[in-house]
UniProtKB/Swiss-Prot annotation:
The gene is atpI. Its main location: plastid. Key component of the proton channel; it plays a direct role in the translocation of protons across the membrane. This is ATP synthase subunit a, chloroplastic. One of its GO terms (molecular function) is proton-transporting ATP synthase activity, rotational mechanism. It holds the Pfam family ATP-synt_A. Keywords: ATP synthesis, CF(0), Chloroplast, Hydrogen ion transport, Ion transport, Membrane, Plastid, Thylakoid, Transmembrane, Transmembrane helix, Transport. It is found in: Plastid, Chloroplast thylakoid membrane. It comes from Phaseolus vulgaris (Kidney bean). One of its GO terms (cellular component) is proton-transporting ATP synthase complex. It comes from the Eukaryota.
Amino acid sequence: MNVLLCSINTLKRLYDISAVEVGQHFYWQIGGFLVHAQVLITSWVVIAILLVSAFLVIRNLQTIPAFGQNFFEYVLEFIRDVSKTQIGEEYGPWVPFIGTLFLFIFVSNWSGALFPWKIIQLPHGELAAPTNDINTTVALALLTSVAYFYAGLSKKGLAYFSKYIQPTPILLPINILEDFTKPLSLSFRLFGNILADELVVVVLVSLVPLVVPIPVMFLGLFTSGIQALIFATLAAAYIGESIEGHH
């Protein structure tokens, strides 16, 4: 009898977990539009963290940097190295864009593991990391697509479109399709990894004591950082590809 009750309780917990739907959202009605409030709230929190951190560091710059300034200088140097490696000698104007992508995704990913979003009650759905929502990752991927089109057109003008018939016009459909698969792969890779990590943690916390999921949480922090680096590196690589005209 006890075994049966335990099995029923376990199945009930699994059913409760399965009720967390990716499409269950909280909306604001603004005029005639429905605004996805969950993503906006968590994104504003992440942006506020980045802006406040940057303000605290740059308000009192010193020749001999303290810990905060030294850390930000290291991050900036790291982003510059990634940009230069992937884009080439014309990397300078693109450092702010690549850096913004990396820092926003990095802090967003970590916020999902470190912030107690779920204690904030909403009428519908629940708060989570911004990158846990497909709308955010698709928006970031589309921004990247706009960036590498702009990079190619500003460097080569209309001659940029000649790449679609190189090395032979037969590859025209494939080259066009590639421009659609790039943002799709960027967005779904990031979304899938972050969503899977959070779901694994939720399932483990529901089924086993809290101590057991802790290693998975630390692994999630590591993979979250890696995903931010992969996204920023690929974005820089696509921009460099548009500028240099090679694959």
